[in-house]
């Protein structure tokens, strides 16, 4: 028999789209962090969730076309980490260009500027990189405005590299 906490956590996960990324703090309104952690670990063991990183979980998304589960969205994982640590993040470099559709190059490292510390996370073949910037550089602007500001800087570097300048 499920406890009230377990049932509420599971209902929230069931109500989310496949591929949704969760962190422990997403359930702070339901239970304390230890109870949440135990419940998320249990749901991982039964296959309802997939652990991406310590404290970061995904409701797996299955592709009928590929006949397998698809990889976690790195941008969604970055946003979940930012949510968990109360960081403000903005994609930069090739990540910004890709998210705006200005580059078709597959980025090897998903890069973000952040008001948090310099930090790198890796899982499977995916790497997230957070670069510290002062609050004034990234706070107070909408996500899209910040993204648009970051993209031209990256685009200029990309074009210079392509033309050999």
Model regions and ranges:
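Basic, helix-initiating cap at the start of DNA-binding domains
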Residues: 1-3
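Short beta-edge/loop segments at beta->alpha junctions of small alpha/beta modules
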Residues: 5-9, 14-80
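Short gly/ser-rich loop at a beta-strand->alpha-helix junction or flexible surface loop bordering the NTP-binding
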Residues: 52-55, 82-123
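Short, hydrophobic/amphipathic alpha-helical patches that form generic packing surfaces
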Residues: 95-98, 143-155
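Protein-protein interaction interfaces in oligomeric scaffolds
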Residues: 135-138
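Single conserved hydrophobic/aromatic residue that forms the stacking wall/gate
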Residues: 157-164
